[in-house]
């Protein structure tokens, strides 16, 4: 199962692709898309869409996992991230790929065992779970890999529950 994880944003979109075979995770690729910061939002979103389409066509994922926006105090920022998230959902839908969205707390819990884990703890767990020498850079790509790992973990848990094998 090849999973594309996406960490959406209007300034930087991180993406990471993992291959999951049984309990073994393998890094396939990762990077980020950085639209011109001075461009208007519609042009940035078009840049992100085009880039994600290229990623999907290059890596041929089976499923896509996207981090959902976190709305704390900065609603304007959450709305902007929501626009980038919608573009990611559209790119996946236009390629008939199943998409699952995960909250930041769910990703932290699945990857590091705590919904309150720090960004550094998540990135270190990504490094360990993918058996890497260094934490992937840029940070947005490491975050996207965490989204993909979260999706794999959730799928594995769902499979165990559906089989009734809780021993």
Curated annotation (Swiss-Prot):
Please give the Gene3D superfamilies that the UniProt record associates with this protein: Ribonuclease H-like superfamily/Ribonuclease H
Q: Which residues bind Mg(2+) 2?
A: 67
Q: What is the protein name stated in its UniProt record?
A: Crossover junction endodeoxyribonuclease RuvC
Record-linked SUPFAM superfamilies: Ribonuclease H-like (SSF53098)
Q: Name one GO cellular component term.
A: Holliday junction resolvase complex
Q: Which gene encodes it?
A: ruvC
Specify the species.
Answer: Dehalococcoides mccartyi (strain CBDB1)
Q: Which GO terms describe its biological process?
A: DNA recombination; DNA repair
Task: Give the molecular function GO annotations.
Answer: crossover junction DNA endonuclease activity; DNA binding; magnesium ion binding
Q: What is its EC number?
A: 3.1.21.10
């Amino acid at each position: 199962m090849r999973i594309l994880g996406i960490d959406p944003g209007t300034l930087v979109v991180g993406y990471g692709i993992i291959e999951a075979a049984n309990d073994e995770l393998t890094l396939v690729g990762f990077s980020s898309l950085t639209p011109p910061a001075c461009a208007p939002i519609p042009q940035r979103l078009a840049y992100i869409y085009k880039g994600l389409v290229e990623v999907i066509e290059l890596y041929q994922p089976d499923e896509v996992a996207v981090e959902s926006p976190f709305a704390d105090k900065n609603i304007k920022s959450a709305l902007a991230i929501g626009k980038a998230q919608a573009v990611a959902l559209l790119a996946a839908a236009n390629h008939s790929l199943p998409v699952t969205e995960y909250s930041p707390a769910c990703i932290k819990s699945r990857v590091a065992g705590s919904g309150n884990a720090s960004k550094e703890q998540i990135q270190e767990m990504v490094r360990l779970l993918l058996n890497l020498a260094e934490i992937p850079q840029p940070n947005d790509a490491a975050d996207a890999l965490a989204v993909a790992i979260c999706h794999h973990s959730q799928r594995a848990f769902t499979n165990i529950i559906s089989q009734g094998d809780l021993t």
